[in-house]
Amino acid sequence: MKVSYHGHSVVKIETNGKVILIDPFLTGNPKTDLKAEDVKVDAILLSHGHGDHVGDTVELAKKNNAVVVAPFELATFLSWQGVKTHPMHIGGSHEFDFGKVKFTQAFHGSSYIDEENKTITYTGMPAGILFTAEEKTLYHAGDTALFSDMKLIGELNNIDVAFLPIGDNFTMGPEDAVLAAKWVQAKTVVPMHYNTFPVIEQDPYQFVEKLQNCTGKVLEAGESITL
């Protein structure tokens, strides 16, 4: 399984001849190396409904006939826009032809904001994502605060790599993320959701230096690891 980071919270997984994107915020993302028009994808996994995570989902899904796996309310909202979806909810799992997906808890919000009409649409509970293929497991925490049930996620799953937000302000910051890394017990931890905007500026190298009992890995946009 090849796992690539593409800035903010964008993660690409290549496994069994399939390409999976998590939270494909590409257009307007100053930290990504990808252009939406160049992306080929078979499935899109969404952690929640905020614009910096849904991103280019509708365009990508329609162009590639890709299925979008998302929390129920968000999946329903996207299906009304002509997107092929597979709704799930926290605690649920499903075996797809590209791998197994399970949604975990996350402490955050989830909504679609229409600036023009000044409306906010609730898009369900936010989630973390466990993805398993080729006997390897990836944990994408989504946007979240630190929460004690991360210990349970670590106990129940043999996590090979965890992507954890460190930006603070909207999610947990580096200090909380160090504790999260300890609790989820991943072999490798990659920081995400930082330096995209001034309010979430952090030093990822300082973060990985503080990690214990795991390998910390800072990935620049376009860099990858193989599990």
Swiss-Prot record:
Family affiliation: Belongs to the UPF0173 family.
Entry-linked NCBIfam families? PRK00685.1 (NF001911)
What is this protein called in UniProt? Answer: UPF0173 metal-dependent hydrolase BCE_4747
Gene Ontology molecular function: hydrolase activity
Q: Which UniProt keywords apply?
A: Hydrolase
Q: Which PANTHER family match?
A: UPF0173 METAL-DEPENDENT HYDROLASE MJ1163 (PTHR43546:SF3), UPF0173 METAL-DEPENDENT HYDROLASE MJ1163-RELATED (PTHR43546)
Organism from which the protein derives: Bacillus cereus (strain ATCC 10987 / NRS 248)
Highest rank taxon of the organism: Bacteria
Work out whether the entry's keyword set contains Hydrolase: yes
Q: Transmembrane region positions?
A: none
Q: InterPro entries, per this entry?
A: Metallo-B-lactamas (IPR001279), RibonucZ/Hydroxyglut_hydro (IPR036866), UPF0173 (IPR022877), UPF0173_UPF0282_UlaG_hydrolase (IPR050114)
Report if keyword Transmembrane helix is assigned. no
